[in-house]
UniProtKB/Swiss-Prot annotation:
<feature type="transmembrane region" description="Helical">
    <location>
        <begin position="475"/>
        <end position="495"/>
    </location>
</feature>
<comment type="function">
    <text>Probable transporter of a GTP-driven Fe(2+) uptake system.</text>
</comment>
<feature type="binding site">
    <location>
        <begin position="133"/>
        <end position="140"/>
    </location>
    <ligand>
        <name>GTP 1</name>
    </ligand>
</feature>
<dbReference type="InterPro" id="IPR005225">
    <property type="entry name" value="Small_GTP-bd"/>
</dbReference>
<keyword id="KW-0472">Membrane</keyword>
<dbReference type="Pfam" id="PF04023">
    <property type="entry name" value="FeoA"/>
</dbReference>
<dbReference type="GO" id="GO:0015093">
    <property type="term" value="F:ferrous iron transmembrane transporter activity"/>
</dbReference>
<feature type="transmembrane region" description="Helical">
    <location>
        <begin position="646"/>
        <end position="666"/>
    </location>
</feature>
<keyword id="KW-0812">Transmembrane</keyword>
<dbReference type="Pfam" id="PF07670">
    <property type="entry name" value="Gate"/>
</dbReference>
<feature type="compositionally biased region" description="Polar residues">
    <location>
        <begin position="79"/>
        <end position="106"/>
    </location>
</feature>
<protein>
    <recommendedName>
        <fullName>Fe(2+) transport protein A/Fe(2+) transporter FeoB fusion protein</fullName>
    </recommendedName>
</protein>
<feature type="binding site">
    <location>
        <begin position="158"/>
        <end position="162"/>
    </location>
    <ligand>
        <name>GTP 2</name>
    </ligand>
</feature>
<dbReference type="GO" id="GO:0005886">
    <property type="term" value="C:plasma membrane"/>
</dbReference>
<dbReference type="GO" id="GO:0005525">
    <property type="term" value="F:GTP binding"/>
</dbReference>
<feature type="binding site">
    <location>
        <begin position="179"/>
        <end position="182"/>
    </location>
    <ligand>
        <name>GTP 3</name>
    </ligand>
</feature>
<feature type="region of interest" description="FeoA">
    <location>
        <begin position="1"/>
        <end position="73"/>
    </location>
</feature>
Length: 844
């Protein structure tokens, strides 16, 4: 029977895993091994993928991948019993009955002890500690608490996509802590896992490894721990989320497990900092050689595999001179597992080909003793999980409470076949509506404050170019952008809730089938959603996607997700031309970006990238209530980033734009003064007509001044390209300057339109009003609702900001893709805006 044939509520025991390559490797390492109990929890709204529970954690698989797993049904449509009933049961492996050392000192070979002996060498008063653990284990929370940093934390895989370093003092030592990306194993299954293994193996090898473990999911998390021990690394375990474990009511003799594994263990609560002083005291005791618990262990891989491991280990010791301190036994096991990176590494060493030949001979001998359904790789994985299960059998007792947890109840609603998609769309609409509606009130207050400051400066500063620079350049440019800070904070508030609660992983789960049809992986959805905040970290988050082709497609379409930098443009124009339906316009723009991403992904899949079918294997973390500290830190970081941008690139851009629009000065100023004097001295005109005619003269003179300025000439030069889509030279200039950062579009419009009048009350008016009422020399409106829509669509699609282009070039490994993203996005923006404008003027 196949796993894909089971129904919701069914329980089965895994018999074997078929398939090959990365899918089989990853699925085995995630606990899908012989003898483990698995329960079907729920299907996605489109019936694919399927949500399973195994070893006390949740994971999703596509049906086509589940069909590769043979199971034996043990309970049909039954209420799930705790997956923790696997804890304490050895893997039913017929090839070995000696995988579990019941005595802490048993099963350590004197022959191999020297080769995997852990050397903890003091390095002055600085200790380099690598922080490593599974995704969602609270690793970054511990990093933030320990180092005082404010790195973003989230309840989904892929929050940390590069190493972060922090330095702090504890006792007499400085501790340099490196937060590595979350990983399930040390197999090079994804770019981040390869990066971690290279970091731990090469000259960057740390003094100590702090392995953060989710105490509520020990069996799954300890698999990585065993791999770290096999590498000969000095390991300390932080039993994180210990408060949640205590609420479960299970009993856990962690000192006994610590002695059994030879690894010191300290209970911690990362979000509150509980247990961290004791944790770092333990690290220091190991560094100083005072800890009596830490020692090497060796897993016996059974009567068939173990002789091959020992023989290959001996050959490696005798034949290879390795550049790094990797244990020979670890290399032997990896070679027998078929680890491609280890094959490459050994093959590059002197006499490496001899070792690979010996490995091939050993595998042939192993195959002669195995059934068709098993191989060396699966037995090695089984034995590791068997070792873990036996150790937990001695130290862990489950309370066997009802498994219908809060996570199950919430998932029954948010991933429901009928309700899943509508709830997701409703949440997104609420996010955009709240961004505009709730943000409008503080935005009005800030805008009034900016206007008041502009009026005061206009009133009390003496006339001159410096006054114009301050009022039109600095206040008009920077002030026009800073008013949108509350809206951006609200947007990040909702994104933070999605990430920290665990809903982000569910969104990827329900969207996987759609993403799969697009040619993308379900995990691509997470970078795309992250793109609503900022495209740069979203592109970096594509590292979690195993398929190179899917990763490339995701990189290229991620800039179509409307980042927070575009939001000020949308709010400005939507508020000016669609005040009663601005939230709906925002939702439509974000939906347009998603729709274009879908279409382009399919196009890229069929033309540029032949996407291989990579399995969707993704853990669904339990729901957690976002802490106020985490949400506030996330929002504060984004606010600080926004304000830094105000004081740097936007301020500089505003000043440059003001200079370009202010010079050269109007050459006919003397004629204008003469005309004004004639009007004022004309006795046939009343005061109202005099004021009206003088205002009209000033308006035309200002238009001519701007058109003759450097920026006006530049805008006129590029306007013919954008004229077919209804854009005048002012809009053209704002789009060109917006290539640096999308907020500069608003600051450019603020500089250009703030100078439209010398009257302080007029200058203090809302920028949106000035844009809406702007007229050309003939008195025609330069803006209309259709042009505003076309401009917003253009800003959505065209040139990613410089930082995004650089990120695409670096992450893809080829700058040609960065250039390609510029060309295709600008071309697509012109086409879409042309269609909006031309179709719009036919009906409106």
């Amino acid at each position: 029977m196949r796993l894909s044939e089971l129904h919701t509520g069914d329980q089965a025991v895994i018999v074997r895993v078929e398939g090959r390559g990365v899918f089989r490797k990853r699925i085995l390492e995630m606990g899908f091994v012989h003898g483990k109990t698995i329960t079907v929890v729920q299907c996605a709204p489109l019936r694919d993928p399927v949500y399973y529970r195994i070893m006390d954690y949740n994971v999703s698989l596509r049906r086509e991948d589940a069909a590769k797993i043979e199971v034996e049904l043990i309970s049909s449509n039954a209420t799930s019993s705790p997956a923790s009933n696997d804890i304490g049961e050895q893997s039913a492996n017929p090839d070995s009955n000696e995988s579990i050392p019941t005595n802490p000192t048993e099963d350590i070979s004197a022959k191999t002890k020297s080769e995997i002996e852990i050397e903890v060498k003091p390095n002055g008063h600085v200790i380099r500690v690598a922080l490593i653990g599974n995704p969602n284990c609270g690793k970054t929370s511990i990093f933030n608490r320990a180092s005082g940093a404010h790195e973003h934390v989230g309840n989904y895989s892929g929050v940390t996509v590069e190493a972060k370093e922090g330095l702090f003092r504890h006792g007499d030592y400085k501790i340099e802590i490196i937060d590595l990306p979350g990983t399930y194993s040390l197999s090079p299954y994804s770019p981040e896992e390869l990066y971690i293994r290279q970091y731990l193996s090469e000259e960057t090898r740390p003094d100590l490894v702090l392995n953060v473990v989710d105490t509520c999911n020990l069996e799954r998390n300890l698999y990585l721990t065993l791999q770290l021990k096999e590498m000969g690394l000095p390991v300390v375990i932080a039993l994180n989320m210990f408060d949640e474990f205590e609420k479960k009511g299970d009993t856990f003799d962690y000192p006994a497990l610590s002695a059994m594994l030879g690894i010191p263990m300290v209970p911690t609560v990362g979000r509150t900092g509980q247990g961290l002083p004791e944790l770092f005291d333990t690290l220091i005791s190991i560094h100083e050689g005072r800890n009596k618990i830490i020692r090497p262990i060796r897993i016996n891989y059974g009567s068939i595999i173990e002789p091959a491991v020992e023989a290959l280990t001996e050959k490696i010791n005798n034949q290879l001179s390795l550049p790094y301190s990797l244990p020979a036994r670890y290399i032997a096991v990896k070679l027998l597992e078929g680890d491609k990176e280890m094959n490459r590494f050994v093959g590059e060493q002197p006499k490496g080909l001899f070792i690979l030949s010996a490995r091939d001979f050993a595998l042939r001998e192993i195959d002669e003793h195995l059934t068709v359904a098993r191989d060396a790789e699966s037995i090695i994985t089984d034995q590791r999980y068997g070792f873990i299960a036996g150790a937990l059998k001695e130290t862990y007792r489950s309370s066997y409470k009802q498994l219908k947890t809060l996570t199950d109840k919430i998932d029954h609603i948010v991933t429901h076949r009928v309700l899943g998609f509508p709830l997701f769309l409703l949440f997104m609409f609420i996010m955009f509506e709240a961004t505009f509606v709730l943000g409008r009130y503080p935005m009005d207050w800030i805008e009034a404050g900016v206007g008041w400051i502009g009026s005061m400066v206009n009133t009390f500063m003496p006339d001159g170019s410096f006054k114009d620079l301050i009022v039109d350049g600095v206040i008009g440019g920077v002030g026009g952008v800073i008013v949108f800070l509350p809206n951006i904070l609200i947007l990040y508030f909702f994104i933070s809730l999605m990430e920290d609660s665990g809903y982000m992983a569910r969104a990827a789960f329900i969207m996987d089938k759609i993403m799969h049809r697009m040619g993308l992986h379900g995990k691509s959805f997470i970078p795309l959603i992250m793109g609503f905040g900022c495209n740069v970290p979203a592109i970096m988050a594509t590292r979690t996607i195993e398929s190179k082709q899917s990763r490339m497609i995701t990189m290229l379409v991620t800039p179509l997700m409307s980042c927070s930098a575009r939001l000020p443009v949308y709010l400005l124009l939507a508020g000016a031309f669609f005040p009663d339906s601005a939230g709906l316009v925002l939702f439509g723009l974000y939906f347009l970006g998603i729709l274009l991403a879908v279409l382009l992904a399919r196009l890229f899949k069929k033309t540029l990238f032949k996407v291989e079918d990579v399995p969707f294997v993704m853990e669904l973390p339990p729901y957690r209530m976002p802490t106020s500290r985490s949400v506030i830190v996330h929002m504060w970081n984004k606010a600080a980033q926004y304000l830094r941008k105000m004081g740097s690139i936007i301020l500089l851009a505003s000043i440059v734009i003001w200079f370009l629009s202010y010079y050269p000065r109007y050459s006919e100023e003397a004629v204008l003064i003469s005309q004004i004097e004639q009007i004022e001295g004309n006795p046939q005109l009343d005061e109202e007509k005099k004021t009206s005619q003088i205002e009209e003269l000033n308006r035309k003179a200002h238009i001519e001044q701007q058109e003759q300025s450097y920026i006006g000439r530049f805008g006129k030069a590029v306007q013919p390209v954008l004229a077919p889509i209804g854009f005048d030279w002012k809009m053209s200039v704002s789009l060109l300057t917006g290539m640096a950062a999308k907020e500069v579009v608003v600051s450019t419009l603020g500089v250009i339109y703030t100078g439209d009048s010398d009257d302080s009350d007029e200058a203090a008016r809302r920028l949106g009003e000035r844009i809406r009422e702007d007229r050309d020399a003939e008195g025609n409106h330069t803006f209309s609702p259709i042009i505003a829509l076309a401009l917003m669509a253009f800003v959505l699609i065209y040139f990613p900001c410089i930082a995004t282009v650089v990120a695409i070039g670096r992450e893809s490994g080829h700058w040609k893709w960065a250039v390609f993203s510029i060309i295709y996005s600008c071309s697509l923006a012109w086409i879409v805006s042309f269609l909006i404008y031309r179709i719009g003027i036919l009906f409106f």
